[in-house]
Structures are given as structure tokens and as C-alpha cells.
């Protein structure tokens, strides 16, 4: 198993399990490849983070204030601004994982966000917790390959 801790990027969207951005610290045997938050040896930079991101876009409508999302697709969250309120919200991005993934998460925020997420991807099960907003945040993840 690998443990990862990340700061930066879209950490605030912790509702999207297993996705982090920034610096990551891994504690694992040197030969083991990555989970959802880092790409092994001792320290790695992320988005090596998304070897198989644990989550997806929400089939439900995206709200600018809060949302509950559940997905089974291969997408990782990205951020976009909603013109009406200029608030970042999570949207589906191009696929970056070859493995099927499933995720369950809740996020809330207007200009910033906080959330909690649980994700599973065939190649890398992961747990993710995040706080923060667009351009900054803190995320904690665990996964194994």
C-alpha cells in the first residue's frame, strides 16, 4: 500500500476520491507503482497523482453551491467557472485512467469548497479527503496498486 499527502491544485474537491494535486509523499516499497495519489519512490510530484483517479463526473446537475456526486466513469475532476457567479465547480474532464473507477462524494462551496470522498478504481483503490478551493487546498489520500 501507499500513503500520500498532497497540497495544492484541486485538493478542495476532496469529494472526488483519490484525486490530488501538488507535492506528494509516499511511504512504500521502492518497487511498487502508484496508487491514486503518487507514483512511488520516496517523493513524487502530482498529477502523477492520477494513475487511476478514483472518481468521476456527477450524472446529476452541477450546483454552484453544493453537490452530491456519484459516478462510474473514467473521468477526473477539473475546474471551470460559472459565468453567472464566477464560482469554480467540478466538471468532467478528459479521461486519464484506463481502469474503471467508481466514486462517491459530497462537495460544498461558492468560490471555495470542502468535501469528502471515497473512491475505488480497479488499478488503485483510494480514499480521499480534501479542503480548500480553486488553486489551493489540502488533500490526503490512500491507495494501493
Curated annotation (Swiss-Prot):
Keyword list, A-Z: Cuticle, Repeat
MF GO annotations: structural constituent of cuticle
Sequence repeats: 27-30, 33-37, 39-42, 86-89, 92-95, 98-101, 123-126
Organism listed in the record: Locusta migratoria (Migratory locust)
Source species, domain of life: Eukaryota
Function comment: Component of the cuticle of migratory locust which contains more than 100 different structural proteins.
Protein known as: Cuticle protein 65
Domains: entry comment: The tetrapeptide (A-A-P-[AV]) repeats found throughout the protein are also present in many proteins constituting the protective envelope of other species.
Amino acid at each position: 500500500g501507499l500513503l500520500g499527502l498532497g497540497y495544492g491544485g484541486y485538493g478542495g474537491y476532496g469529494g472526488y476520491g483519490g484525486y490530488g494535486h501538488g507535492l506528494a509523499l509516499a511511504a512504500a516499497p521502492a518497487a511498487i507503482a502508484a496508487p491514486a495519489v503518487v507514483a512511488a519512490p520516496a517523493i513524487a510530484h502530482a498529477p502523477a497523482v492520477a494513475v487511476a483517479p478514483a472518481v468521476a463526473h456527477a450524472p446529476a446537475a452541477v450546483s454552484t453551491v453544493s453537490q452530491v456526486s456519484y459516478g462510474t466513469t473514467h473521468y477526473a475532476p477539473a475546474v471551470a467557472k460559472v459565468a453567472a457567479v464566477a464560482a469554480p465547480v467540478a466538471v468532467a474532464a478528459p479521461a486519464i485512467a484506463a481502469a474503471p473507477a467508481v466514486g462517491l462524494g459530497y462537495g460544498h462551496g461558492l468560490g471555495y469548497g470542502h468535501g469528502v470522498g471515497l473512491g475505488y478504481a480497479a488499478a488503485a483503490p483510494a480514499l480521499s479527503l480534501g479542503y480548500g478551493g480553486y488553486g489551493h487546498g489540502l488533500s490526503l489520500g490512500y491507495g494501493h496498486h
